[in-house]
């Protein structure tokens, strides 16, 4: 199956660290983004928000009122994502462990006892997600948790990671009971799908509590088909050039495996990052389908402003480019949800017959029409044909940290204005970027809906088709098709920018009547 539509805010920039704590530090980070006018949509809470690393709890000292934290983030145009790991602290006075034990839902050892393994809270028990009763129990835990105003959920260390075993995960002879259409079996049989079964259960629990909204779940472990339940990131990378470069083929491979929303921790998670590394990373990482900055405990601050003015300015440019392209990313998310096409694509997708493109791991495509060449790329193999360099933000082509962007001949890319977060209106105005092919023609489309909820399934969306054609000394751009009963803010009005050898030529008007751009 394909990935269902995610909420639009999840295509914005995310800021995380292990950990923002206490609650006032979370709000301070949010306020700094707004003060510095660096676009951002979500702040992430790692395990320090919990009471002694007990899942589904809040630290009474650092986060005495999580509902107020979420309210204050929402007032600033942010969404929040909070971590939930699989391991529950072995503590007879802790409600999750107590109810899990009473319901007998834990994974068992080979001799039939509850398996306890060392995790963040110390000794922990682990739900058996093959067992229907365990899933029902797990799903019910989300009711009170989401009632605090939590937006997204982060299921981490769900391989599962166990610190006191030789293989750093469950013993292979642990027992999963199965049920429904899953047979009983040893952990060696179920290891690769433990995280997958966890996020499936989490999604079902979130949907039961909040059926009117689209869930957003991020997972570290997943499996083929898991895109139906969660986005997948590349895990605990390090602040080093090898991991920066490796993130491109890793994200591409996730996309080719059916998981369209993926990315690496921008700046690197482990170890300290320096300014040059971070600037280079966000310069192309802003184009990951899932774009999030993250940092490990004990490492330096890695927010966009943490490395001085030059990197702060470079980060702002990179993220402004991302937000201008939001209508294009959202259209590609819709495509992924309908036919499974990845958002981030290998360059050989543009010309499968050109075997020289097959091994390219530095440059990549966003959709069919946008070529991204990271600043670190040395002699990347690029597709032939018309690809014109594109500038979206003042200074973006002169900044040494920014990836080069090229638009494909024959394409029309929908873009919006610079916004600080997705609660603001993108399409006021809509700008269409046009690059003609050898025949003087171009086409493109835009998908738009409410950004959350399921009304698009009942026709509340707008899927618009655009064409451009050169006639004599002008290019005429038109809206040539529209499906769905939804309206977009621009009401058929648009700015058109035709990218030519002479530079960018502009015009504006009504797309139904046709917009003429004089050459």
Explain the meaning of each model-derived region.
Residues 410-511, 519:
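Accessory, solvent-exposed terminal regions and/or long lumenal/extracellular loops of proteins
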Residues 398-402, 510-519:
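Solvent-exposed, conformationally flexible loop/turn segments
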Residues 1-402, 406:
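Catalytic-domain carbohydrate-binding cleft regions of carbohydrate-active enzymes
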């Amino acid at each position: 199956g394909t990935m269902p539509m995610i909420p639009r805010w999840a295509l914005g920039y995310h800021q995380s660290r292990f950990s923002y704590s206490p609650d006032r530090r979370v709000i301070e980070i949010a306020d700094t983004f707004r003060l510095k006018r660096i676009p951002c949509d979500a702040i992430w809470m790692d395990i320090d928000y919990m009471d002694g690393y007990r899942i589904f709890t809040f630290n009474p000292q650092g986060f005495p009122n999580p509902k107020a934290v979420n309210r204050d983030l929402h007032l600033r145009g942010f969404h929040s994502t909070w971590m939930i790991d699989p391991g529950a602290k072995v503590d007879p006075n802790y409600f999750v462990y107590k109810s899990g034990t009473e319901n007998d839902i834990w994974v068992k050892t080979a001799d039939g006892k509850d398996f306890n393994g060392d995790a963040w809270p110390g000794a922990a028990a682990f739900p058996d997600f093959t067992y229907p009763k365990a899933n029902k129990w797990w799903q019910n835990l989300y009711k009170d948790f989401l009632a605090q105003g939590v937006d997204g959920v982060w299921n981490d260390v769900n391989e599962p990671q166990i610190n006191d075993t030789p293989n750093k995960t469950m013993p292979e002879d642990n027992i999963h009971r199965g049920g429904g259409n899953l047979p009983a079996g040893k952990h060696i049989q179920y290891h690769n799908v433990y995280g997958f079964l966890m996020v499936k259960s989490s999604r079902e629990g979130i949907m039961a509590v909040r059926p009117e909204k689209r869930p957003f779940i991020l997972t570290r472990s997943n499996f083929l088909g898991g895109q139906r339940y969660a986005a997948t990131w590349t895990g605990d990378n390090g602040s080093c050039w090898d991991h920066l470069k490796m993130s491109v083929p890793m994200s591409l491979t996730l996309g080719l495996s059916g998981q369209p929303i993926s990315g690496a921790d921008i700046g690197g998670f482990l170890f300290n990052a320096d300014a040059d590394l971070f600037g280079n990373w966000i310069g192309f990482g802003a184009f990951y389908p899932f774009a999030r900055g993250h940092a490990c405990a004990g490492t330096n601050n890695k927010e966009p402003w943490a490395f001085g003015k030059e990197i702060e300015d470079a980060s702002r440019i990179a993220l402004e480019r991302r937000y201008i392209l939001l209508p294009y990313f959202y259209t590609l998310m819709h495509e992924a949800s309908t036919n499974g096409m990845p958002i981030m694509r290998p360059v050989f997708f543009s010309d499968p017959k050109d075997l020289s493109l097959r091994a390219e791991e530095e440059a990549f495509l966003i959709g069919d029409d946008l070529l991204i060449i990271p600043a670190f790329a040395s002699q990347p193999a690029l597709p032939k044909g018309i690809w014109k360099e594109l500038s979206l933000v003042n200074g973006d082509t002169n900044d040494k940290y920014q990836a080069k962007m090229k638009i494909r001949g024959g394409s029309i890319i929908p873009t919006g204005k610079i916004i600080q977060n997705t609660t603001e209106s993108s399409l006021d105005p809509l700008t269409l970027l046009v690059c003609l092919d050898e025949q003087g023609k171009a086409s493109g489309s835009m998908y738009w809906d409410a950004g959350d909820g399921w009304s698009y399934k009942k026709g509340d969306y707008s899927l618009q088709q655009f064409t451009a054609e050169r006639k004599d000394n002008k290019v005429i751009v038109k809206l040539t098709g529209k499906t769905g009963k939804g309206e977009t803010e621009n009401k058929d009005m648009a700015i058109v920018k035709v990218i030519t050898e002479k530079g960018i030529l502009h015009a504006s008007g009504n797309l139904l009547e046709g917009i003429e751009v004089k050459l």
